[in-house]
Design a protein with these regions (language model features):
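N-terminal acidic leader/helix
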Residues: 1-31, 60-69
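Short, charge-rich amphipathic interface segments used for partner binding and complex assembly
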Residues: 25-64
Length: 69
């Protein structure tokens, strides 16, 4: 599973149709979804957790390679 997540994050990091600020906004949205579930004592939505992970890795890859998309 980890290799698939890394591959998806790498693809997103190199996608010039998605801006870095859009990725950051999506990370913030996923954080809200996760925190809301935690505050309600509900299970954390797996899709939100997985998506946040992919987005976070993609943004870090961009920052580390100085891609300013």
């Amino acid at each position: 599973m980890r290799n698939k997540l890394a591959a998806m994050a790498n693809t997103l990091a190199q996608d010039d149709t998605v801006a870095s600020d859009e990725i950051a906004a999506a990370i913030d949205y996923m954080e809200i979804k996760i925190r809301t579930a935690e505050a309600r004592n509900e299970p954390v939505p797996f899709v939100a957790f997985r998506t946040r992970t992919i987005l976070t890795i993609a943004l870090k890859l961009r920052q580390e390679s100085d891609l300013s998309l």
